[in-house]
């Protein structure tokens, strides 16, 4: 006798959001870095963790492929992770971060392939990934430090050159 796995589900479930260029059932964030945060050399040197929320139809041995600004980190879901409430906590090593965009938008997204080779979003999906999580990369070591603005000898984040140009 031969055992055959027949699956009628896809990782992340059926995408219920028409028109988006990502799978709505796949969500993630980066531990300690709200979206839009600056990714600087000290953060990159330590690596960071992607927190992937438990998605519909998560199974042991699903392959989670995390796209990190042009490069991939792969993670296989363990039995303990599949049984847990989530999120998956996947380390993105400094070596991968350093390969990514050095200045400007630094995108992180993921897709899932299950053991039957079903990909998130389904067979005909043009976009099998989660919504991109975007950080602001300042990894380029040639960048200058932020300017320091003084208004009446007090450091200020907001300067109105029309009214404060002589300050």
Please name every model-derived segment.
Residues 1-167:
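Intrinsically disordered, low-complexity linker/tail regions enriched in polar/charged residues
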């Amino acid at each position: 006798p031969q055992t055959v796995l027949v699956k009628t589900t896809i990782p992340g479930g059926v995408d219920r959001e028409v028109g988006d260029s990502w799978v709505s059932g796949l969500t993630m964030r980066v531990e300690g870095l709200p979206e839009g945060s600056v990714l600087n050399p000290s953060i990159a040197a330590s690596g960071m963790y992607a927190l992937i929320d438990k998605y519909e139809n998560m199974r042991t041995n699903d392959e989670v492929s995390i796209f990190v600004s042009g490069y991939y980190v792969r993670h296989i879901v363990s039995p303990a992770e599949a049984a847990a409430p989530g999120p998956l906590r996947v380390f993105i090593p400094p070596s991968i971060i350093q390969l990514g965009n050095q200045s400007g938008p630094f995108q992180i997204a993921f897709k899932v392939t299950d053991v039957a080779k079903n990909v998130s979003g389904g067979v005909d999906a043009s976009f099998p990934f989660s919504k991109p999580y975007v950080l602001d990369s300042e990894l380029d070591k040639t960048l200058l430090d932020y300017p320091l603005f003084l208004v009446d000898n007090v450091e200020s984040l907001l300067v109105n050159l029309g009214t404060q140009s002589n300050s």
